[in-house]
């Protein structure tokens, strides 16, 4: 994954005014100050900075970035397409209004492999517990992760049965899909759903929960809200399993080189996975427009605290969780669930040891 050093950030910051003034073109001459692997990301940085100012030169920079990115990164060409379709930086579709968009992403080969590794990690990390399982799924989406996790835990003897499942998601459509899926798989279990965001209801959740699961769901909150929310939830949980993207979209300022470089890598990789050889497939297109575009545009147009994505590196997660959950809840496991040249996902387990 591309990581900018302080000297790189300084060079990018020095070059941006030349881009904005029109003194610099994406022809490679001024970019000789950059390392070769940074050129595509810098052109994305320049193109999105121009797009944020409604500058007509943005597509040229983004197109030049796409030309050097190759098929594994699709951020530049997708943002250029957004500008062509919408005329400005705006998400083409509303997020999470159609479960099919999320389902397409979750069933990609890379995400299937990631989910399988997450389930394997959970089985390896969680201790055997007698009795029935009470579980809370935060941001459950369409329920696919939990639907794979629960039978694996029971089959491995981590719990004898599943007695109660609480599903939490802000999207009524996603929650409905998840509730139907889990209730069908576990007809003898009590399955309830709440249309809500965790940060709004953490202190009111009944609990207690033997297991709390958060799969790609807690990154929507900035660090201070994560800390406050998890502290409110801590008394109700015994074990916490998280799956998250290893990236820093929490601390960098809007329009900064670090944020642009990270978005170019991580969301560029996601878009390449979604669109791939199926770029004309309407389901793939809907997945990009509904699942990725709202997050991508938010990162490019909204400041910290207001944007929808606040991913954090795993080291910051460990520090935050230790602070929020208190001394009774300890780290019990960490594993890379998916490693690629452009984006990594990791799994975390914290719990109350016997």
What is the role of each PLM region?
Residues 1-73:
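N-terminal accessory segments
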Residues 90-126:
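Class I SAM-dependent methyltransferase Rossmann-like catalytic core
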Residues 200-206:
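Short conserved loop adjoining the S-adenosyl-L-methionine
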Residues 213:
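A conserved beta-strand element that flanks and buttresses the S-adenosyl-L-methionine
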Residues 216-220:
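Short catalytic micro-motifs in class I SAM-dependent methyltransferases
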Residues 221-232:
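A short, conserved alpha-helix within the catalytic core of class I
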Residues 245-322:
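C-terminal alpha-helical "lid/dimerization" subdomain adjacent to the S-adenosyl-L-methionine
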């Amino acid at each position: 994954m591309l990581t900018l050093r302080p000297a790189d950030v300084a060079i990018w910051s020095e070059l941006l005014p030349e881009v904005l003034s029109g003194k610099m073109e994406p022809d490679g001459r001024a970019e000789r100050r950059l390392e070769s692997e940074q050129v595509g990301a810098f052109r994305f940085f320049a193109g999105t900075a121009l797009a944020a100012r409604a500058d007509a030169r943005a597509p040229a920079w983004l197109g030049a970035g796409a030309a050097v990115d190759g098929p594994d990164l699709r951020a530049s060409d997708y943002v250029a397409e957004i500008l062509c379709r919408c005329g400005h930086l705006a998400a083409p579709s509303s997020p999470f209004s159609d479960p099919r968009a999320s389902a397409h992403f979750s069933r990609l080969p890379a995400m299937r492999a990631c989910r399988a590794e997450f389930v394997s990690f959970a089985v390896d990390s969680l201790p055997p517990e007698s009795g029935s399982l009470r579980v809370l799924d935060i941001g459950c989406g369409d329920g696919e992760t939990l639907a794979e996790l629960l039978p694996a835990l029971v089959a491995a003897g981590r719990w004898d049965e599943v007695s109660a499942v609480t599903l939490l998601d802000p999207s009524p459509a996603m929650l409905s899909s998840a509730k139907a899926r889990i209730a069908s798989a576990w007809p003898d279990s009590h399955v309830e759903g709440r249309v809500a965001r965790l940060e709004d209801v953490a202190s009111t959740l009944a609990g207690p929960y033997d297991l709390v699961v958060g799969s790609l769901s807690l990154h929507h909150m900035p660090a201070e809200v994560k800390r406050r929310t998890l502290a409110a939830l801590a008394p109700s949980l015994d074990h916490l399993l998280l799956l998250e993207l290893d990236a820093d979209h929490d601390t960098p300022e809007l329009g900064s080189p670090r944020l642009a470089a990270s978005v170019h890598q991580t969301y560029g990789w996601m878009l390449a996975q979604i669109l791939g050889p199926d770029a004309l497939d309407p389901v793939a297109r809907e997945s990009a427009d509904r699942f990725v575009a709202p997050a991508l545009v938010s990162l490019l147009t909204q400041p910290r605290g207001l944007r929808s994505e606040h991913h954090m590196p795993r080291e910051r997660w460990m520090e935050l969780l230790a602070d929020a959950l208190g001394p009774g809840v300890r780290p019990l496991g960490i594993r890379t669930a998916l490693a690629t040249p452009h984006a990594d996902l990791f799994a975390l387990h914290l719990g109350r040891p016997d």
